[in-house]
UniProtKB/Swiss-Prot annotation:
Domain of life: Bacteria
GO CC entries: cytoplasm; small ribosomal subunit
Organism whose genome encodes this protein: Blochmanniella pennsylvanica (strain BPEN)
An example Gene Ontology biological process: translation
SUPFAM superfamilies: Ribosomal protein S16 (SSF54565)
Name of the molecule in the record: Small ribosomal subunit protein bS16
GO terms of molecular function: structural constituent of ribosome
HAMAP family with a match to the protein in the record: Ribosomal_bS16 (MF_00385)
NCBIfam families per UniProt: S16 (TIGR00002)
Assigned keywords, A-Z: Ribonucleoprotein, Ribosomal protein
UniProt record similarity statement: Belongs to the bacterial ribosomal protein bS16 family.
InterPro entries for the chain: Ribosomal_bS16, Ribosomal_bS16_dom_sf
Length: 80
């Protein structure tokens, strides 16, 4: 089953997440099919708001193909 989920990056105590298309059997930060965006939950002093960038065209394509988003990714996409 193909999933749309977050893969963690960044440093200790400063998380950064890639929004990836992956097989559900792969590890959280393991192999992925395609990277479709990123999410940074930490506010930085030099920019306003949270960092979120998503290629909605590719997300719609994968949803059409039957990919299921994780709860967190679904919440992020709905807020766009």
């Amino acid at each position: 089953m193909v999933r749309i989920r977050l893969a963690r990056g960044g440093h200790k105590k400063t998380p950064f997440y890639h929004i990836v298309i992956t097989d559900s059997r792969s590890a959280r930060d393991g192999r992925f099919i395609e990277r479709v965006g990123f999410f940074s939950p930490i506010k930085f002093s030099n920019r306003t708001g949270l960092g979120l960038r998503v290629n909605l065209e590719r997300v719609k394509y994968w949803l059409y193909k039957g990919a299921s988003p994780s709860d967190r990714v679904l919440k992020l996409i709905k807020n766009l």
